[in-house]
Each structure stands twice: as C-alpha cells, then as structure tokens.
C-alpha cells in the first residue's frame, strides 16, 4: 500500500505546487465560464434564434481562439524550459515570436470572417427548422460576429502575456485581470442586453459590445501590470527594443511549434465540424448543444487547469534535465487529474436536470439538453486522462506525435463517426453524441502507451 501511495500520490509540497498553479487558472476560467453561462442565459431569455445565432458564431470564433492558443503554446513549450534555466533572453524571443504569429493569425481571421461570415453561419443551418427561424438565426449571428471581430486583437495580446506569465509559474496576475474583465462583461451585459438604467436595449449587439469592452480592459490590466513590475518579470526589460529573434531559435520553435499550431486549429475546426454534423438533426439540436456546452465549459475547467499544470511543471523539470523526476511527477499529476475530475463529473450529473430550466426555450430542447449534459458528465474522467496525456506529450516537444494523437484522430475518427451516424442512420442525437464520445476511449489507450514508453522525455532548449 505504501509503495502504491509513493508511486501515484505526492506529498504536501507536491500538491501545494500543483494547486498554486492550477487553482488560479481554475478560478479565472471558472469565473469566465460562469459569466459566459450567465451571458448565455441572458441571451437565451430573448429567444431561441438569438441564442442559436450567438452559439454558432462562438463556435466559429472558437477556431480562432484555439489557433491563438496553438500559436502561443508552440513557443510556450520553450518558454517553460527557458524559465527552468532562468534564461531571460530566451523568454523574450518566445514572447516576440508569439506576438508576431498572433498578429498574422488575427489578420487572417479578419479576412475570413468579413468575406465569408454568412457562409460559415449558414453551414450550421442545414438541418430541420422553419425558414423564419433560419433567417432570424442568420441575422442575429451576423450582428454578433461583426462586433466580436473588434475584440480579436485584444484577445490575442492578452493570450501572449497571460501564457508567458503562466509558463513562468506566475498565474495570479492573469487571474486578476480575467476577474476584472469578467465583472465588466457581466455588468455591461445586464445594461446593454436589456437596456437597464437608461442604456439602449441592444440584445445580441449589446452582448457583443460588452465582451469587446471587457477584453480591452483585460488587455490593458495585464500589459500595464506586467511592464510595471520588471523585478518579477525581468523579460519585459528591453523586450520591444528590437523584435529580432535568432534564426536558430525561430527554426526550433517552428519545427516544434508548427504541429501544435496546426493541431489546435484543426482540432477546433474539428469541433466546429462536429457541431455541424450534429446540427443536421435539426435546429433544435443547435440550441440543446448550446445549453450543454455552456454548463460543460464550466466543469471542464477542472481538467483544463490540471492539463496546464502538467505542461508547466513537467516542462520546467524537463528544462533542468531531470528525466526521472519529470516522469514521476507526470504520473502523479495524471492520477490527480483523473481523481479530481471524477468528483466533478458526479456534480455535473446531479445538476443536469436543473440547468436547462433557466432557458426560455421549448420543453423538448430542455429535455434533450439535460440528457446531453448527463452524457458529457459520464465522459469527464476520460477527458481528464486525455488532456493530461496530451499535455505530457507536448511538454517534451513531441508536437508531431501530439498532432496525430489529437487533431488527426479528431478528423479521422470523431468527425467521420459523427457524419456517418448523422447522415446514414436514424439514430437520435443522444446516441450519436454518446458514440462519438465513446470513440475517444481508443485515443486514451494510444496516449497511455505513448506516455508510458517515455517518448516525451527530452530537453529541447539545450
């Protein structure tokens, strides 16, 4: 028993370090998703079409968000290991790389959404639904998208700074900036969606304006606070004196980071395609999935934060060259993540019958959403394992393996399964959703074998 405890569980200092990193991320993400949930409920009170339009656009912008996440994460692997070596110059190179790549991705997103926004939204409106509801959903979606585009550059800058701070083990400032932004978003949502205290009742437009304002505030807070404290953040000193990056550093980041950028972008596109496959079962499914994803995002922060803890802690240990400690730490982190998320799954299952009642929509949509939430809860422990395995592979720079493990599997297995079941069978959305989730068990087995073999154990900055 003692041997098992030592192998799979850490001591007090171990968990203190883990939760010093994970808890601020959980708090920030938790508050963010809680306010997003309230935002979603507020929009849902206007009507099903407005809720569906906003949901579709958020699914499209989710691809951009994960593209930025991939852009900063590729360089972030090096940031964590440079920090483990206390190499300030190296950290500066990664920040510049993140910013330049983020600008390019943002310009591309602007072009795609402005030129092809209506076409992208229409892709989700192919299922059953009246012509009137489809037109209304498209109208609200276009309104929301055009305003949300203004916030993309601010989101990108925030992610560049927040990711760098986290990779250096500093999670408090991003949390504080996130909380401030969330409170601003919540207050403006209430004022601008419903027109309270003399403000205009802008509905969907009000929700978009509130989000953009909150992102501007978050960017201002995190950038100013970081640069005003060069003692704790030495990488800011001379950071923009030049934007040059040594060619060998660029080459290493591109080699390791490109698969990660492609992975996050293709994975997000895969998730958007899954939603499109599900929507073939009718417009009511879009609404039910929106309700499901809203509450799921709140509970998914548990394994998302633990995954980031894996990437940061294991990455820093790999930077020191202690492979034995990295492997031992990673094993304990994976076990902790799965156990924590099992408890989270039970709580989500209990809440499933209650949450859909907050939406002003039909009983059929509420019932479908309740069952989808229960299915999602059932697979949270599996997702916790998958997330920890993915971040383990990524921490050691095995980004090509992570690419095949994550996005290639998504497109070749998940999307193909969803499309086949949606178009070639009469199965309900509940069974289709269940079987798609179940296919990830194969990915879990593959990931477990790769991590156990130790293919990820390497220092990539020496």
Locate predicted features.
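Small-residue-rich hydrophobic transmembrane alpha-helices
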Residues: 51-111, 155-174, 275, 286-352, ...
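N-terminal transmembrane alpha-helices
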Residues: 9-41, 45-46, 62-74, 78, ...
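Helix-terminus/linker motif at the lipid-water interface of multi-pass membrane proteins
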Residues: 30, 34-52, 121-135, 193-202, ...
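Short alpha-helical transmembrane segments in multi-pass integral membrane proteins
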Residues: 1-22, 79-151, 199-258, 314-379, ...
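Generic alpha-helical transmembrane segments of integral inner-membrane proteins
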Residues: 26, 30, 34, 38, ...
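Transmembrane helical elements of multi-pass membrane transporters/channels
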Residues: 20-39, 147, 181, 214-218, ...
